[in-house]
């Protein structure tokens, strides 16, 4: 597993008995297939300062903590996945608290969780999510690693990051299997950026250029083929039936990544 602190797991364990990447694990059925919806915002990140490959936290929060973007997150939940077990990754602790409040104002059982919370409060929030009394968890960095819930079926990537490691850690919070869970839906919030401060998205992190709303991004070959056959006929796969999306929509994504050109000059901790 990739770690944000840059620690090399081989230093601890020396020998690797078995190694499997995300793509292989999904294709072999170890992890659930992954679908994606990209939601474009009108937020401009081009003048957000960066340090290595980290956004300046104050710049980022000032860009993202605005009513219009927050409402877009809430509206997206209500429109596409209302009632589904969802984790929303937010830009800051205050941002997470605001999104949770807006969701509650719209009748959604949502809570924010952060490292600022007392241990007993944090444990109760996580337990309520596990037992079903809470449908949505809004978090900043607390849930990036060391926690997951197999019941999570939707991830909102509402916190831009230029770190592939952080994005993959967040993605891992929803990929585990459990009874009744057919796949994971990732909703990427796509803000405007230039080629040198562009955040990761599911397609960019997996180096997949073609995007079609709700289509499989990763899946076993037989499931992917079944979906594509239905799309070719102009029909919606069963998983799409309740989602108001036009099956003809598609997009080619710019996969340029300047980090690949300078990776030898940037520490693994930053990547």
Residue ranges, per PLM feature:
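Long, largely alpha-helical accessory region at the distal end of helicase-like NTP-driven motors
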Residues: 78-79, 85, 196-271
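Conserved strand-helix element at the start of the C-terminal RecA-like helicase core
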Residues: 61-106
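A conserved SF2-helicase RecA2
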Residues: 19-32, 50, 176-233
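Post-DEXD/H (motif II) to motif III coupling segment of the RecA-like Helicase ATP-binding lobe
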Residues: 1-37
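Conserved helicase ATPase core of P-loop NTP-dependent helicases/translocases
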Residues: 87, 96-104, 108-144
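Conserved SF2 helicase motif VI
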Residues: 162-182
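SF2 helicase motor core recognition
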Residues: 29, 137-155, 171-176
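Short, basic/glycine-rich phosphate-binding loops at helix/coil junctions
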Residues: 41-58
């Amino acid at each position: 597993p990739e770690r944000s602190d840059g620690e090399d797991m081989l230093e601890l364990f020396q020998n690797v008995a078995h190694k499997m990447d995300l793509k292989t694990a999904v294709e072999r059925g170890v992890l659930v297939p992954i679908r994606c919806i990209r939601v474009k915002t009108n937020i401009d990140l081009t003048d957000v300062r960066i340090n290595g490959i980290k956004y300046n936290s104050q710049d980022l929060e000032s860009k993202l903590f605005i009513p219009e973007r927050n409402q877009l997150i809430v509206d997206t939940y209500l429109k596409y996945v209302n009632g589904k077990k969802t984790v929303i990754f937010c830009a800051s602790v205050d941002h997470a608290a605001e999104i949770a409040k807006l969701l509650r104002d719209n009748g959604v059982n949502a809570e924010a969780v952060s490292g600022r919370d007392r241990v007993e409060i944090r444990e109760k929030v996580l337990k309520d999510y596990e037992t079903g009394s809470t449908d949505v968890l809004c978090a900043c960095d607390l849930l990036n690693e060391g926690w997951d819930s197999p019941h999570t079926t939707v991830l909102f990537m509402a916190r831009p990051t230029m770190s592939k490691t952080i994005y993959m850690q967040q993605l891992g919070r929803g990929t585990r299997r459990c009874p009744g869970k057919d796949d994971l839906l990732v909703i990427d919030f796509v803000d405007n950026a230039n080629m040198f401060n562009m955040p990761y998205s599911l397609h960019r992190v997996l180096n997949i250029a073609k995007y079609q709303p709700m289509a499989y991004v990763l899946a076993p070959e037989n499931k992917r083929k079944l979906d594509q056959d239905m799309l070719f006929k102009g029909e919606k796969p069963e998983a799409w039936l309740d989602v108001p999306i036009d099956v003809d929509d598609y997009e080619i994504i710019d996969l340029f990544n300047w980090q690949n050109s300078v990776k030898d000059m940037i520490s693994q901790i930053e990547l």
